């Protein structure tokens, strides 16, 4: 049995396993549940509230499982609230094609923090930074190595009216001349 004893810090493998099993228990497939487990581990690793956010979201959808997003377009609106997990997996699976859109907008996405690790992993695959702009602030994701934000960790947003994803180009902060001068020193 996996449980947290007292104030003992939960190890990453346990976070991933419990997140995966809880997701499967509310109706996600094993494949999606595995992706959820990895994503919650990433959030916790970056000191973001993955467990508490997933717990709240799974309680919300327990009796009404969300629908999958069929296609991702430049602008994505739905009569229903969008599932951050299905949306995140769809982006992760198609990130090489989606980066050509440069900017993608989603409206009414549930628990937007849950999409962040999928985008962080996508950033690693395409080897480019991704900026995520929400109603309450911004995340900058850099190749699954850093997640920067100006959003308070205690801000547990349950829905984002608008979420914008921007695929950024890699840019050098130095000139060709500076590079050549440095290289000559070798």
Residues covered by each model-derived region:
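A glycine-rich, acidic short-motif signal
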Residues: 51-147
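Generic N-terminal amphipathic, Lys/Arg-enriched alpha-helix
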Residues: 7, 14-26, 36-39
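Electropositive phosphate-/nucleotide-binding environments in soluble metabolic enzymes
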Residues: 13, 30, 34, 48, ...
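Glycine-rich, aromatic-bearing surface loops/beta-hairpins
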Residues: 106, 120-186
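Single conserved hydrophobic/aromatic residue that forms the stacking wall/gate
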Residues: 1-10
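Alpha-helical scaffold segments in soluble metabolic enzymes
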Residues: 18-21, 39-42, 53, 118-121
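N-terminal interaction modules that seed assembly of large macromolecular complexes
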Residues: 28-64
């Amino acid at each position: 049995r996996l449980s947290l004893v007292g104030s003992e810090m939960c190890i990453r493998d346990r976070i991933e396993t419990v997140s995966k099993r809880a997701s499967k228990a509310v109706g996600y497939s094993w494949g999606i549940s595995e992706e959820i487990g990895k994503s919650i581990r990433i959030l916790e690793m970056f000191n973001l509230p993955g467990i508490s956010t997933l717990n709240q979201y799974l309680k919300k959808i327990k009796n009404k499982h969300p629908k999958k997003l069929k296609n991702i377009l430049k602008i994505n609106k739905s009569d229903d609230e969008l599932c951050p997990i299905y949306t995140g997996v769809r982006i992760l699976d198609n990130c090489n094609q989606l980066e050509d859109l440069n900017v993608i907008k989603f409206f009414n996405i549930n628990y937007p923090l849950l999409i962040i690790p999928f985008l962080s992993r996508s950033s690693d695959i395409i080897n480019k930074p991704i900026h995520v702009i929400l109603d309450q602030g911004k995340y900058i994701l850099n190749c699954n190595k850093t997640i920067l934000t100006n959003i308070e960790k205690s801000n547990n947003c349950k829905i984002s009216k608008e979420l914008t994803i921007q695929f950024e180009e890699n840019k050098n902060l130095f000139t060709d001349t500076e590079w050549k001068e440095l290289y000559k020193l070798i």
